[in-house]
């Protein structure tokens, strides 16, 4: 009585092996076809974009939390104007100043551009983060070939974190009223 069951198992194992072999062959064929398409696409990408000639100001926008910063990047000597004031006056905290200048320092362009910024909303940290994003976007527009460096450092990534809204029945966004068992 046990022999018919063994024969059925052997037949199903043979069928499974045939299915696996067919699937593997189909996968290899698909990979080879896609690989050819990817190879031609990557060959096109190796052509680097030439830097844009700065004939006018580059204008970009950066956002972080509730802050919005509009930046105008023009050829100059490395001067910053934030709502009509210098960077040191507007951001007295050295950490915020370093955060803002980071994209320029990374690409070694600290004294190549003058930056005029309009900052609205949020607090100093949010404004500094938005300012950094706007500067990075402007540098990317100036020379798209340097996009990889900016992206790798995380300067072109918009930080999507924002304050979570308060929910009904809770004290804050997640703080629930104290629980009493009895």
Curated annotation (Swiss-Prot):
Tell me a Gene Ontology molecular-function term this record carries. Answer: RNA binding
Asked if the keyword Repeat belongs to this entry, the reply reads no
Q: Name one GO cellular component term.
A: small ribosomal subunit
Supply the alphabetized keyword list: Ribonucleoprotein, Ribosomal protein
Q: Which SUPFAM superfamilies match?
A: Ribosomal protein S5 domain 2-like (SSF54211)
One Pfam match: Ribosomal_S9
Q: Which InterPro entries does UniProt cross-reference here?
A: Ribosomal_Su5_D2-typ_SF, Ribosomal_uS9, Ribosomal_uS9_bac/plastid, Ribosomal_uS9_CS, Ribsml_uS5_D2-typ_fold_subgr
Q: Which NCBIfam families match?
A: PRK00132.1
| Family that this chain belongs to | Belongs to the universal ribosomal protein uS9 family.
In Swiss-Prot or TrEMBL terms, this protein is called Small ribosomal subunit protein uS9
Q: What lineage does the source organism belong to?
A: Bacteria, Bacillati, Actinomycetota, Actinomycetes, Mycobacteriales
């Amino acid at each position: 009585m046990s022999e018919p069951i063994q024969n059925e198992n052997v037949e199903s194992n043979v069928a499974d092996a045939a299915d696996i072999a067919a699937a593997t062959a189909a996968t290899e064929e698909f990979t080879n076809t896609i690989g050819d398409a990817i190879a031609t696409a990557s060959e096109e990408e190796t052509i680097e974009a030439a830097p844009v000639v700065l004939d006018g100001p580059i204008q970009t926008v950066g956002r972080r939390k509730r802050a919005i910063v509009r930046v105008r990047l023009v050829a100059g000597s490395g001067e910053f104007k934030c709502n009509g004031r210098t960077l040191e006056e507007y951001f007295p905290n050295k950490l915020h100043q370093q955060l803002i200048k980071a994209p320029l320092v990374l690409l070694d362009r600290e004294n190549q551009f003058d930056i005029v910024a309009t900052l609205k909303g949020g607090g100093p940290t949010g404004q500094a983060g938005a300012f950094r994003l706007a500067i990075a976007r402007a540098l990317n527009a100036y020379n798209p070939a340097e996009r990889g460096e900016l992206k790798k450092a995380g300067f072109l990534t918009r930080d999507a974190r924002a304050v979570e809204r308060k929910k009904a029945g809770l004290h804050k966004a997640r703080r629930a009223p104290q629980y009493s068992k009895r």
